[in-house]
Curated annotation (Swiss-Prot):
<dbReference type="GO" id="GO:0019843">
    <property type="term" value="F:rRNA binding"/>
</dbReference>
<dbReference type="GO" id="GO:0070040">
    <property type="term" value="F:rRNA (adenine(2503)-C2-)-methyltransferase activity"/>
</dbReference>
<feature type="binding site">
    <location>
        <begin position="171"/>
        <end position="172"/>
    </location>
    <ligand>
        <name>S-adenosyl-L-methionine</name>
    </ligand>
</feature>
<feature type="binding site">
    <location>
        <begin position="227"/>
        <end position="229"/>
    </location>
    <ligand>
        <name>S-adenosyl-L-methionine</name>
    </ligand>
</feature>
<feature type="active site" description="S-methylcysteine intermediate">
    <location>
        <position position="349"/>
    </location>
</feature>
<feature type="binding site">
    <location>
        <position position="123"/>
    </location>
    <ligand>
        <name>[4Fe-4S] cluster</name>
    </ligand>
</feature>
<dbReference type="InterPro" id="IPR007197">
    <property type="entry name" value="rSAM"/>
</dbReference>
<dbReference type="GO" id="GO:0000049">
    <property type="term" value="F:tRNA binding"/>
</dbReference>
<comment type="function">
    <text>Specifically methylates position 2 of adenine 2503 in 23S rRNA and position 2 of adenine 37 in tRNAs.</text>
</comment>
<dbReference type="GO" id="GO:0070475">
    <property type="term" value="P:rRNA base methylation"/>
</dbReference>
<feature type="active site" description="Proton acceptor">
    <location>
        <position position="99"/>
    </location>
</feature>
<feature type="binding site">
    <location>
        <position position="119"/>
    </location>
    <ligand>
        <name>[4Fe-4S] cluster</name>
    </ligand>
</feature>
<dbReference type="InterPro" id="IPR013785">
    <property type="entry name" value="Aldolase_TIM"/>
</dbReference>
<keyword id="KW-0819">tRNA processing</keyword>
<keyword id="KW-0411">Iron-sulfur</keyword>
<dbReference type="GO" id="GO:0051539">
    <property type="term" value="F:4 iron, 4 sulfur cluster binding"/>
</dbReference>
<dbReference type="InterPro" id="IPR040072">
    <property type="entry name" value="Methyltransferase_A"/>
</dbReference>
């Protein structure tokens, strides 16, 4: 069962898939085509209220208003980077806050969404886990992040649309699986936002390997990324406490099951921490771990964005990163050093939210 997670009793209509919206409409005495009209208003015309749906009856609009809200998020802070990255801080109906990031890529507009308010995974280098999980983010609230970013461009008369989505914001997506899957089905719907499945990536730390197997059977063509960050259990446990319950042996058994079932590539995210996990010896361990799986593997080396609360960690030097990369390439591993975005704003995941919460507490003191 999903926990009671908002003070607003009406859910966001964005949380319904098209089939669920049709089912709701029929149950409420409306024809199927009326639900299709609502869907078109939501995702093609992208209206901001039910009253703008001009081909619906007043009675049907009243039904919609009684049952749903449209967009449950309120924009609190917007930070724009010199490189075009935009970071948003949104407030939810129960006054908790989440982050969303827009990144301009050579291939289009990519949005990084948040799936939980806070995080309990306990990664020692990450800003997201500084503030523990308060609740899950509903499917409607996740979709709303995309809609508000798109609104940002629509209002400016810019002919640009969100083309890619990465589920890599605050929280562990597979710890909010039901809402995650509804969100994915909504944004992937060909009659709506029509964001291609292969343009969507979901990242997990692997805290529940069984969820990776379940994801394989849900049979979406969505990309899977694994937050790996270390090639052995001892080092990974020191960085990610979830390794105690999900050691690499269990994690890779699930990953192997996923690739055998789907024949889809897995991306391994590896954050580069100076003096912790960035030596050539550790690079060789990573290569040995991935080598037999290399046909369906890709390693993403990520420059670390320092976090004030985690002063122990510093980003690897460019020289050490290059040496690490070279070891992987010499072993035939598919890899890349990730392009940085938003380095002149609160770039690390969770940083902006943490800073705003501290500011709010200071005002109340």
């Amino acid at each position: 069962m999903t926990e009671n997670i908002t003070t607003e009793t009406r859910p966001s209509i964005y949380g319904l898939t098209r089939d669920q919206l049709i089912e709701w409409a029929i149950e409420n005495g409306e024809k199927k085509f009326r639900a299709t009209q609502v869907w078109d208003w939501l995702y093609r015309k992208r209206v901001q209220s039910f009253e703008e749906m001009s081909n619906l009856s007043a009675v049907f609009i009243d039904k919609l208003n009684e049952a749903f809200i449209l967009n449950p998020l309120e924009q609190v802070v917007v930070q724009e980077s010199a490189d075009g990255t935009v970071k948003y801080l949104f407030m939810l109906p129960d006054k908790v806050m989440i982050e969303t990031v827009l990144m301009r890529q050579s291939y289009g507009l990519s949005v990084c969404v948040t799936t939980q308010v806070g995080c309990n995974m306990g990664c020692t280098f990450c800003a997201s886990g500084i503030l523990k999980k308060e609740r899950d983010v509903t499917a409607g609230e996740i979709v709303s992040q995309i809609m508000l970013v798109q609104k940002y461009f629509d209002e400016r008369g810019l002919d640009e649309r969100v083309s890619h989505v990465v589920v890599m914001g605050i929280g562990e997506p597979f710890d909010n699986y039901e809402h995650l899957m509804n969100f994915l089905r909504v944004i992937n719907d060909d009659n709506g936002l029509a964001i291609g499945a292969r343009h969507i990536t979901v990242s997990t730390c692997g805290f529940m390997p069984a969820k990776i197997k379940e994801f394989a059977h849900d049979n979406l063509q969505i990309n899977l990324a694994i937050s790996l960050h270390a090639p052995n259990n001892e080092l990974r446990t020191s960085l990610m406490r979830i390794t105690r319950n999900a050691p690499l042996e269990k994690l890779f058994e699930a990953i192997d099951y996923y690739t055998e079932t789907t024949n889809r590539r897995v991306t391994y995210e590896y954050i580069m921490l100076s003096g912790e996990n960035d030596s050539p010896e550790i690079a060789q361990q990573l290569a040995d771990l991935i080598k037999s799986r290399n046909k369906l593997s890709y390693v993403n080396l990520i420059p670390y964005n320092p976090v004030a609360e985690h002063i122990k960690y510093e980003r690897s030097t460019k020289d050490n990163t290059a040496k690490f990369y070279d070891v992987l390439k010499k072993n035939g591993i598919n890899c890349v050093v990730r392009q940085e975005h938003g380095t002149d704003i609160d770039a690390a995941c969770g940083q902006l939210r943490s800073k705003q919460i501290k500011k709010n507490k200071a005002k109340l003191a």
